[in-house]
């Protein structure tokens, strides 16, 4: 496990250099979307339409930020549960999106797509939306304004603190942690 400062876009080479458990400080452009936005984007792709942003090597943050206070770039911007996007994540990766930021476990189908398309799943700290918002230096609404907090935004972040939860080889920090706990627990119990 390493501590790394990385700059986007998340190229295939950069994605392959990351490992489950790595602590990263992310700088660059990311896009926001939640389930309603993902559904619209996947429907647009099914109709042969272009997405509101170029998905090539893109990183998508699963967030619905609160409104910005006067003088602030954005309001609280904590991660939402990633499982809500599991139905759409393989499609998004198939068109070039590579990074996903959220919280919680992912379905096996998403992990398989990550292995196929060199995707990386980053975990952000739930409950720390105000802290994460401080890393967001620019925010621009780019599509689906009618979705309110779930509208698509283009953000520029600096040193956003994340952890690689699942790397592009399918290594999963959640599973590794569970296995390490059980191994230690069984050792203590004499099993």
Describe each PLM feature range.
Residues 32-33, 37-160:
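Feature captures the catalytic cores and cofactor-binding loops of soluble hydro-lyases/lyases
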Residues 1-10:
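Short, structured beta-strand/loop micro-motifs enriched in basic residues and often containing a Trp
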Residues 10, 30, 65-67, 159, ...:
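A broadly conserved detector of short glycine/acidic/proline-rich loop/turn motifs that flank catalytic sites
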Residues 26, 134-191:
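C-terminal binding/interaction regions
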């Amino acid at each position: 496990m390493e501590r790394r400062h990385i700059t986007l876009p998340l190229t295939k080479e950069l994605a392959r250099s990351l490992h489950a458990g790595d602590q990263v400080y992310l700088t660059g452009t990311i896009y926001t979307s939640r389930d309603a936005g993902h559904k619209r984007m996947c429907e647009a792709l099914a109709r042969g339409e272009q997405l509101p942003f170029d998905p090539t090597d893109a990183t998508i943050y699963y967030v619905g930020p609160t409104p910005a206070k006067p003088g602030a770039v954005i309001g609280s911007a904590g991660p939402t549960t990633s499982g809500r996007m599991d139905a759409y994540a393989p499609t998004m990766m198939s068109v070039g999106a590579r990074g996903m930021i959220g919280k919680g476990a992912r379905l096996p189908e998403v992990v398989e797509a990550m292995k196929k398309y060199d995707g990386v799943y980053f975990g952000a700290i739930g409950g720390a939306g105000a802290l994460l918002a401080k890393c967001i230096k620019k925010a621009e609404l780019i599509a689906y304004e009618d979705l309110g907090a779930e509208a698509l935004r283009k953000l520029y972040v600096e040193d956003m603190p994340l952890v690689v939860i699942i790397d592009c080889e399918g290594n999963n920090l959640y599973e590794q942690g569970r296995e390490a706990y059980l191994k230690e627990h069984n050792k203590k119990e004499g099993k």
